[in-house]
Each structure stands twice: as structure tokens, then as C-alpha cells.
């Protein structure tokens, strides 16, 4: 998951696997020498830490524990909402609940979707939400923001929805509950 610094630039990437990495994956991470972006200069990554969550001294904030989490990058629903028998199905809120059950094995007590104004204030509209070519983005091009509240604190990282493996749908723990 890419994480931006205070200026909004990605300055590090956290690679996370809930079940850990096998020896071949560790070798692949250790052998990564150069990254290239479209029209940019190469970046030379450095592996800083490798290990279990409980043994690492400093973890990125996204690995924190909280009962409240909120969107850092836009949540893109993996499915399009639809109307079946006069009832709206697969709303962004319903998909977040479903993904929490599937991915986290926890269902939030509440899912508070951000208003379009709040999502815009948080900069969620600045992300590219359409493919350059090929099939359209699942769930439509709308980017959503949300705040999740769980019954008990859970540990991150949390990334849900379309493109979660590329840094979309990332949530951060909320420490200060005075929103």
C-alpha cells in the first residue's frame, strides 16, 4: 500500500500479507532493485523491515488498532448498484459491510458514508477513477469515503474494494474521536 508524506508524495510502500510471506516471496522483495513509473525517473527501493507485526518496533500508522476507521483513499465499489424487485442492492455501504465480513471477518456496527462535499473536502475526488483503456471500472466511476465503527478495536491495515491491492480503499485508524 502506498503512503503519502505530508506534501502528498508517496515516499514509501508497505507490502503486507495477512498470512506472511513464503521464502520465494521474501527473496523477491529482497531482490527488488529498481521501480519505473510512466514518464518518471527510476526509483531505487530499500527494504527497511521484514517480520511479524508483533515483532516490529515501528509500524506505519495504517497498522494501528482502533474501533473507528476512515477512508484515506477513495473506496471504489467492486459491483454496480442495481435495483431488484424495486429495492436498491449493492449500495456502497452494503458492499463495505460485505467486504468487511469477507476480508476482515468483522462487520462494522456502523458505516457512515461521507457526503459528496465531505469526500471532496478530503481530496477523494483527486484520484483517477477511470481506466485509460479496456473494461470500465467495476461499480462505476464514483469514489466514496466512509467512516467505520466496530464493536472492539481491530488492527490494520484495512483496504477494501476495487483496486485495494493498488492503494485504493485504504482506511486509517481514528485515534481522536472528536470528528
Question: What do these predicted regions represent?
Answer:
Residues 1-179:
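RNA-interacting cores
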Amino acid at each position: 500500500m502506498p503512503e503519502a508524506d505530508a506534501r502528498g508524495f508517496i515516499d514509501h510502500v508497505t507490502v503486507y500479507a495477512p498470512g506472511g510471506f513464503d521464502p520465494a516471496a521474501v527473496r523477491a522483495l529482497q531482490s527488488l532493485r529498481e521501480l519505473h513509473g510512466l514518464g518518471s525517473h527510476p526509483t531505487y527501493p530499500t527494504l527497511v523491515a521484514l517480520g511479524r507485526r508483533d515483532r516490529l518496533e515501528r509500524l506505519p500508522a495504517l497498522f494501528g488498532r482502533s474501533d473507528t476507521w476512515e477512508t484515506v483513499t477513495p473506496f471504489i465499489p467492486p459491483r454496480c448498484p442495481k435495483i431488484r424487485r424495486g429495492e436498491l442492492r449493492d449500495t456502497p455501504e452494503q458492499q463495505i459491510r460485505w467486504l468487511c465480513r469477507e476480508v476482515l471477518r468483522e462487520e462494522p456496527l456502523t458505516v457512515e458514508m461521507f457526503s459528496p462535499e465531505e469526500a471532496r473536502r478530503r481530496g477523494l475526488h483527486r484520484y483517477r477513477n477511470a481506466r485509460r483503456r479496456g473494461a470500465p471500472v467495476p461499480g462505476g466511476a464514483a469514489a466514496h469515503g466512509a467512516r467505520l465503527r466496530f464493536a472492539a478495536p481491530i488492527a490494520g491495515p484495512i483496504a477494501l474494494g476495487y483496486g485495494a491491492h493498488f492503494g485504493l480503499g485504504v482506511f486509517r485508524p481514528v485515534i481522536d474521536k472528536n470528528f
